[in-house]
Amino acid sequence: MLTFQQMILTLQAYWDRQGCALLQPIDLEVGAGTSHVHTFLRAIGPEPWRAAYVQPSRRPKDGRYGENPNRLQHYYQYQVVLKPAPENILVLYLGSLEALGLDLKQNDIRFVEDDWENPTLGAWGLGWEVWLNGMEVTQFTYFQQVGGIDCKPITGEITYGIERLAMYLQKVENVYDLVWTEWVENGETRRLTYGDVYHQNEVEQSTYNFEHSNTEILFRHFAEHEGEAKRLMGNGDGADAAAETGTRLALPAYEQVLKAAHTFNLLDARGAISVTERAAYIGRIRNLSRQVAQAYYDSREALGFPMCGQRDGARA
């Protein structure tokens, strides 16, 4: 049996052999691995890119106080980004399942059409859910547009739901029963479970998300992050320096967009935003994402798209 961390190490080793740069998660609160700068921005423009990483993901509304066996407000995704998307991407994915010890002939693996869209990032793609014996464990996406910019070439994204896949591999019904790691100490096998690591966090973060977050402070934070992103894009209050020099700082601005997006998610979980306001807030974040995407594209174009000379992909 693979432990939770052995499963991650196995995926790391497998995608390393496929030429991926093994990166670290972005050190900000995000709702999915797609929001990582090395997926969202790297999908823009013609430069090749291959990367893989674990991404802790937060979705405040999905918290259940640690009482639901398979629903979490904090969970993990394993993200693989291949640009341009190789013709054998499905073969590569199935190979990763075999590396995890799955017998493809003994298990029911289905690809169910499920096109993907992220309104706040102005991104969408054609894709499939991957179902393993009736349970969704992976999302496949061929990015068509990111930040309002058409993807040329197409980027292939593979997003594993690590907890769900691990629950099947370990044959447990409750995520908190997953074996995170095990070792032998004084002749006895010791185990650390997912619940040991994260159950208290789920209880307390759910309590904060739904009951104790300060909406007044959160609304102020949203306005601050939005304003800072605008300033770094050369518009809004205090944007004179960026506007005069023509310097738009896409990467710092994108971090502000991500902070604004997470703040919005906290407000949404708290029930502080009406249905009408929700659409308006999403539109504001999407507008910033598009500005950042264009600024990033322009900055890479000004450099002559330097990674286009790398024939076999891009390793960091």
UniProtKB/Swiss-Prot annotation:
Q: Which InterPro entries does this chain map to?
A: aa-tRNA-synth_II/BPL/LPL (IPR045864), Gly-tRNA-synth_heterodimer (IPR006194), Gly-tRNA_ligase_asu (IPR002310)
Q: What class of enzyme is it?
A: ligase
Report the domain of life of the source organism: Bacteria
Q: Does the keyword Cytoplasm apply?
A: yes
The membrane-spanning stretches of this chain are: none
Pfam families (UniProt xref): tRNA-synt_2e
Task: Give UniProt keywords alphabetically.
Answer: Aminoacyl-tRNA synthetase, ATP-binding, Cytoplasm, Ligase, Nucleotide-binding, Protein biosynthesis
Query: GO molecular function: any one?
Result: ATP binding
Q: Where is the signal peptide?
A: none
Q: Where in the cell is it found?
A: Cytoplasm
Protein name in the entry: Glycine--tRNA ligase alpha subunit
Q: Which organism is it from?
A: Cupriavidus taiwanensis (strain DSM 17343 / BCRC 17206 / CCUG 44338 / CIP 107171 / LMG 19424 / R1) (Ralstonia taiwanensis (strain LMG 19424))
